[in-house]
Amino acid sequence: MNELMKIFGQVSGTQSFDQIRISIASPERIRSWSYGEIKKPETINYRTFKPERDGLFCARIFGPIKDYECLCGKYKRMKYRGIICEKCGVEVTLAKVRRERMGHIELASPVAHIWFLKSLPSRIGLLCDMTLKDLERILYFENYVVVEPGLTPLKIRELLTEEQYMRAVDEYGEDAFTAKIGAEAIRDMLTVIDLETEKAQLKVDLKETTSEAKRKKLVKRMKLVEAFMESGSRPEWMILEVIPVIPPELRPLVPLDGGRFATSDLNDLYRRVINRNNRLKRLIELRAPEIIVRNEKRMLQEAVDALFDNGRRGRAITGANKRPLKSLSDMLKGKQGRFRQNLLGKRVDYSGRSVIVVGPELKLHQCGLPKKMALELFKPFVYSKLELYGMATTIKAAKRMVEKERPEVWDILEEVIREHPVMLNRAPTLHRLGIQAFEPVLIEGKAIQLHPLVCTAFNADFDGDQMAVHVPLSLEAQLEARVLMMSTNNILSPANGKPIIVPSQDIVLGIYYITMERDEVPGQVLKIRSMDELKGAIANNAILFYCPTDPNTKIDTKDLDTLLDRLASRNVTAHRRVNPSSKDALEAGLKGGHLRLFNVEKPGVPLVFADVNDAEKAIKDGKAILFKVPVFVNMAEIEEALTEKTITLHTKIRARFDTVDSEGTPVTQIVDTTPGRMMLSVILPKNKNVPFSLINRLLTKKEIQNVIDVVYRHCGQKETVIFADRVMGLGYSNAFKAGISFGKDDLVIPPEKETLVGETEEKAKEYEQQYQDGLITQGEKYNKVVDAWSKCTDDVADAMMKQISSLVPGKQINSIYMMAHSGARGSAAQMKQLAGMRGLMAKPSGEIIETPIISNFKEGLTVLEYFNSTHGARKGLADTALKTANSGYLTRRLVDVAQDAIICEEDCGTTNGLTVSPVIEGGEVIASLAERILGRSAARDIVNPLTGEVIVKAAQMIQETEVELIDAAGIETVVIRSVLTCDSEEGVCGSCYGRDLARGTRVNVGEAVGVIAAQSIGEPGTQLTMRTFHIGGAAQRGAEQSSIEATFDGTVQVINRNVVVNSSGASIVMSRNCEVALLDINNRERARHRVPYGAKLLVDEAQKVTKGTKLAEWDPYTLPIITERAGVAHYVDLTEGLSMREVVDEATGIASKVVVDWKQQPRGADLRPRVTLRDEKGEELLLANGLEARYFMSVDAILSVENNTKVNAGDVLARIPRESSKTRDITGGLPRVAELFEARKPKDHAIISDCDGRVEFGKDYKSKRRILVVPEEGDAIEYLIPKGKHISVQEGDYVRRGDPLMDGNPVPHDILKVLGVEALAQYLINEIQEVYRLQGVKINDKHIEVIVRQMLQKVEITDPGDTTLLVGEQVDRVEFDIENSKAIREQGRPASGTPVLQGITKASLQTHSFISAASFQETTRVLTEAAVSGKVDSLQGLKENVIVGRLIPAGTGAVMNRLRAIAAKRDKDMQVEGESEVPAIPPVAEGSAPEAPPAE
């Protein structure tokens, strides 16, 4: 039995604890930790440097200074181990016990623990049922408190001032009642509390109380009382009688040179406590006057407060250098505190850092490591090898050899490094690809070489970036580095599943260059071997001569000598003309594509003929010439022709492409291509799913990424890596050969620019004039001008792109265009500024300056324009600095909230899921169904609606093949499994998560999907904020949408149609929720557009439209208020100077009537400004729904009709101007993402309707308007909306549940309450994706779902049923389920609750684990709360395990944990067996520690 134990080793020991409990220490507990009382404030003797006895560094209490040596030197060496010296009282032992032995200070008077007093809500206050102010009055000796009123009329816990106390003593006598002062009073009050009776009383009070505020307070007290009962702590322990003193080595005193000392602030703080405590003892012994004693007690309380949390109360105590002393709390708090500095982030040994340079000759899995660095990093390995081979006898000798850098050392180093991966890391590490493993290759020099393809993942460039190298030491670490972190294993990005090992910059340019196809002059350039041959060919008319500068000019061939000269000097190119021998030969040649017909006038233009006869006739008439298409059998021939220069890389040729079919047998295809693409085809892996058509096109960066993706999916990882490396080689060499560079003439300024700018200037003048004439307001003018210039800038840019991208035969393609189009460098936006016009600039506030910058950088800016442009550019730079921090903080909060979302089982078996459909905006499909469901599991069977066959079974993963089938079947919506609806207790299950995006396979159990999600969302945030300044602040905003066009041919369907025809005969939409849908031939809805109120509807139901037809149009800058009937308009409550004023525009002198905020004045309080329609007799008209025709005005509305004037149906009564949209960059975007994840209320949020029903306006309430929504049955629900806000519904409108009643963003909590979890998820996903989409960043939906799941962990109890839960209490979902199943087991009624949405910060602070929460934010508060309730941390998340120094329960750690659990069980079973067999032997094996209790 024992032998077995020895082999396996026991699993338990000091290290193996399963949980950590935190609770309040009782005075007895503190004394039991202590090794002695500290009585003196002295630290060390300044002459002997020995610690003073009974002082803060006392050797008798804390242990010896030197190993195995007592203080006086009587006992030295190991043999006296454990002896206590009788002279100095020091135990002979290791000096490191000074790191673990504690002392204590016995206080002369009890003091309150500041954490329990001041940490809100004050725990002491809650238990005593007193306010914090009152408590402080008692503690700091201002008031007495009645502890025991006796028979006097005084109340318990009543406060008495000194005079009142004296009066009461006089009146009732000293023994009639007890009143005390200071911490003792509070200790007595806490001691008498009986938790059981208190709880019973609270239950009674809860039942009786009616007020909500009281209930909340009672619930809080109830929770606190229950916490104390559960944890077994006593309330009076919150008042300290003994103070523990931490070990001296943890608050060291270090002698500096020059006889001064550096000391930890804690020593100062402890010294103050001891001094005051001793003085207080002496005063009490001397029976000093009460007032002096009290003052000393107060000072003691303050000293202890400062020790625990300096600065929490009153002014912080400062040291000699005027800065506050660092108290115990400060040691834990913040970035520099214990948690974040030393427990979550540690510095590691065996690491180095250096500048990186590019290493294009490396393989993907290699990195170049400077020899010097490698030798230093791998020293121990080198030493052991030197010893092993007998080159060095001792480690010291080996050390000398290494220091001298003897030649054999380098050979050993090579051997040590072989197959030993190292990890490279570039800060900031924003996602897991910021650390990857490589095999080192030794290089000369001092810089690390990095493979170019991994730069994207590291976000590295070679302008001076530095990287750190780490060496994994143990075999397991090396294994993990190789299997999980090797760069070759990280081809796909975890954020979106697309390859991240993609070529960029030069490589892209090279590949783009060789895949270009150019119609130079058609045909085959000649190489003539002899003069005679040339003469013969000319005579036979088999040759055509062209001038190369202008390939359209034919050269006359009469004068042979000049011709030869010109051929030699390359002024002429000759092309072979083919004369087919017969009609059949011609037909065969044309069919096989070996011949091509060309126009004689323009030899660059191929001709198409209906049949062979036409072709023959054209050739006879000399209208057409045949040219030969070069045909090549293999790559060798192509290479030869390229060296011979008979063809270029871009000539059209036919060639043979070798590949394999599905069985794997080699096949050849004949393809029309170019030599450059053939070069690419050689390195393409042979696979039936990787066709030649994949690369037989112009390859831009996106296309190359796509090629790599396809190769990865079909050929596997190894092939992909080899292919990527080869692509890199090919790209680099060809970029070098192409020699693409640009000069200033490559920036082509389009000739149309002047006319476009001129036209727009005219327009702007015209708007100015309209404004002068009072037809439009200042705001509308601004919007129109800005729009006009936006459009002009885009038009100039388009003209420039057209000019630059046009191909002129015989001329080189524009280099800048090639760079931008290929995605190698630069963008259309940058080119626009270089050669188009810079356009509109934004002010720092985000508004757009309406005078644009007309010049571009090539022309140069005028002084004024330059000044305008500095505005935006400077903002960009300032933003970058500020936003990086914000983004990093967002990532930190996300990681914290999601860290314990780990895949914990294969399948939870739920049938719930989310309904997914394509995202359509403005009629365009932004995210197709295919990309949204790829790699997810189906929640139910997906059936083809036409055939009824099952495409995907429930719980099966949807792969690429299934996606194609679903697309083909025309399915519009699919229900997929989602983490949001996963039923796993801990973490999430594999089925609900679906595909692991970084591997392309189903996710493994133990994958930390939460952290991956957080990184995927946070990483682009930082990227984007760092990129604002590249465009230099140029405003980017599209013109506001002002019309809807059909995106394809189809039939119109108008939903919720409610229109009136106005005086000019146009149909005006009067409905708030009118939509236009387009149906295709099979009556499937292909697009749906919302038509705003007041728009002109240009089509009708069932009308057939073609693509590009306008369906509706409107003015995007104003919200109109429109009449439904003809009549006479009357102003009601529109009083000049009160609710309306004439605004005379200074610029135009034209007056317009504007509704102003009438609530500002007292007499305006009850007004409801409106325009009412009456008939000729003055009777109020009624609308179709039976309500009076009156239209309420909101603040800032501009009236368009005069009082008592006739109006027609569909006329505009008033316009409400909309603010112009600010430019949207991620600066606006990042805070928006944070706002959504924090679940904050948006600034001007919309109120949404809770039910379906009709809208009615109720009586106004103070400054709010009352809107009633009346459902079919049940009571009306009323909403109060501030009067100035524009209400987007009219009286009598029918609204659906969840419809907004006013403008603005809805509040996520409302969506959850009204529409449920799924709608909330859809809303959050769409809103967050919207921000990233604007920046062109792709993030998979599932990452956002993981975070939203973490935000929805809590449930608010609405009905406790027969459980112990309380109404209004927020409990964890899991806890809720456990309680309910318990209730059901006992035949009780289960509780019911509603899901609660929490912001990510709040959610992370409320995790199960107090260690994780404390290390995140508000450390003291979290720890106080945890201690009071005696929380147990079961160490389930990642963070808490990192902090206590164990393997994290994810990835390989999850497997280890499982094995450890099995082993522990085995140990237990074996012990039980052993006990039953041999009862005499004690169960603990030799040499192993007994089971440790849970660590405190």
Curated annotation (Swiss-Prot):
GO cellular component, as recorded: DNA-directed RNA polymerase complex
Region (Disordered): 1467-1496
GO molecular function, one term: DNA binding
Entry keyword annotation includes Membrane: no
Enzyme class: transferase
Binding site for Zn(2+) 2: C908, C982, C989, C992
Keyword Nucleotidyltransferase: yes
Annotated keywords: DNA-directed RNA polymerase, Magnesium, Metal-binding, Nucleotidyltransferase, Transcription, Transferase, Zinc
Domain of life: Bacteria
Stretch forming the signal peptide: none
Cofactor section: Mg(2+); Zn(2+)
A biological process term (GO) from this entry: DNA-templated transcription
CDD domains (alphabetical): RNAP_beta'_C, RNAP_beta'_N
Pfam family, one: RNA_pol_Rpb1_3
Classification via InterPro entries: DNA-dir_RpoC_beta_prime (IPR045867), DNA-dir_RpoC_beta_prime_bact (IPR012754), RNA_pol_asu (IPR000722), RNA_pol_N (IPR006592), RNA_pol_Rpb1_1 (IPR007080), RNA_pol_Rpb1_3 (IPR007066), RNA_pol_Rpb1_3_sf (IPR042102), RNA_pol_Rpb1_4 (IPR007083)
Binding site for Mg(2+): D461, D463, D465
EC identifiers of the protein: 2.7.7.6
Cofactor annotation remark: Binds 1 Mg(2+) ion per subunit.
Substrates-to-products reaction catalysed: RNA(n) + a ribonucleoside 5'-triphosphate = RNA(n+1) + diphosphate
Gene3D superfamilies in the record: 1.10.132.30, 1.10.150.390, 1.10.1790.20, 1.10.40.90, 2.40.40.20, 2.40.50.100, RNA polymerase II, clamp domain, RNA polymerase Rpb1, domain 3
Stated family: Belongs to the RNA polymerase beta' chain family.
Function, as annotated: DNA-dependent RNA polymerase catalyzes the transcription of DNA into RNA using the four ribonucleoside triphosphates as substrates.
HAMAP family, per database record: RNApol_bact_RpoC
Description of how the protein assembles with itself and partners: The RNAP catalytic core consists of 2 alpha, 1 beta, 1 beta' and 1 omega subunit. When a sigma factor is associated with the core the holoenzyme is formed, which can initiate transcription.
Protein name as annotated: DNA-directed RNA polymerase subunit beta'
Organism: Paramagnetospirillum magneticum (strain ATCC 700264 / AMB-1)
Higher taxonomy: Bacteria, Pseudomonadati, Pseudomonadota, Alphaproteobacteria, Rhodospirillales
